[in-house]
Structure formats: structure tokens, C-alpha cells
Amino acid sequence: MLHGWYGDTKQMIRIGTSTIPSAYILPEILPAFGKTNPNVYFSMNQSDSQKVIDGLLQGIFDIGFTGMPSDHELLECIPFYEDRMVIITPVNEHFLHYRAEKTPDLAAIMHEPVILREKGSGSKKSADSFIESLGMSEDDLNVMARINDQESIKNLVAGGLGISIISEKAAQNLQRENKILVFQLPEHTSHRQFYIVYHKDYIYRDYMKSFIEYVKQYYQS
């Protein structure tokens, strides 16, 4: 059995999280949980999904949030939030022409200069699945950059460097500001899950158990 040590009065939860949960999901969940659990505080570290999983196995984190599942025998991996992947492009006459089409040619759009996430991220795996569904591989793409920061990707797309495939939730703010165009992917390739990940054999304290259950139920309708 694994057991974490904490000071007598500190109710700390060490969280490892991938990019999307860190930027767009946990900012909703943590304040809501904190309202009824004011003595709990969080130490949060952001990296890609694989590093979060590695950190859990190394005892660095108590709880992880990832954009891809883990099948490791020591970890429990529970989906708690569903998102969609979308293509984002600059707002210009060229891409507005695609937008005017009743059914935009996504394969043609993917031949435009593209910005990709680094390997190890759940977003990269989801993007790869869509690209494969088009009968394409990464070798067929005109890759302009590989970047791990979602906000940087969005700003570079808005600035005209290229297109990208990102989380719909992450795209919403710049879409509302008319700084990017968003193209929906086919249903069978667009959906992705986010997961709360934790040790099966960890002796969790009650406030940690409460947080895990709170997250599981937060987006349940």
C-alpha cells in the first residue's frame, strides 16, 4: 500500500494535470470545491498527459488529470469530461471561402501549413486519429511548428502561421472574439475524453476521497 505524508493541519492535494484540464476545466472545479472545503489547498503542476501518468507512478502527484487513458495496473482511470477536437484556422479570405462551403473540404484544409502539439499529449493522439481517418499521415503534412503550449498555438494560428487541431473548449474564447475560424470534425473522430487518474492502492485521506468523488460527479447532468 502507498501512503502520503502530510503535516497535521495541512490538507494538501498534489495535482498533476495536462494542458486542457489545467487551463479550462480545473478553474471551474477547484473554486467550486473550495467553497465547501476551505481547508483544502492544491499544489498543481502542468505537463503533458504522459508525464502526469509518470508522476503518479513516481509518487509526485496524488491525483492526475489527463487527455488520454492509462492502462497501467496500478492506476484507476475514470472519464469525467467529454470534449471535441476541431480544426482552427486564421480569419482571412482564403479560409472564409472554405467556411462558405456547405461541407468544407477538411482534407484540403489539412494540406495547409499546420502547427502540431508535441508527442505525449492527449491532443496530439486525438489529432493523429483524425489525420489517419483522412488516409493521411504526419509525413503528408506541411508542419510549420511543434509547440506544447495551447495558448501559443491559438495565437500563432490567429496570427496566420498555420492551422491546428485543438480542443473545442480551448478554441471558444478566440472564436468568440472572431480571431480564428473553427471547423467541426466528423462525429466519429472528434470526441475525446478527459480522465481523473489516481492510485488503486493509495490510502487516500477523506478530503482526497471527497475531491475525487466531487470531480466524478461535477459534469454529470
Model-predicted segments: where are they?
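Hydrophobic hinge/microswitch elements
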Residues: 48-53, 57-61, 66, 129-181
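Short beta-strand->loop
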Residues: 76-86, 142, 171, 176-190
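Short, well-ordered beta-strand segments
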Residues: 12-16, 64, 88, 115, ...
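Flexible hinge/capping segments at coil-to-helix
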Residues: 6-7, 77-115
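Alpha-helical linker/hinge and terminal dimerization helices associated
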Residues: 1-6, 211
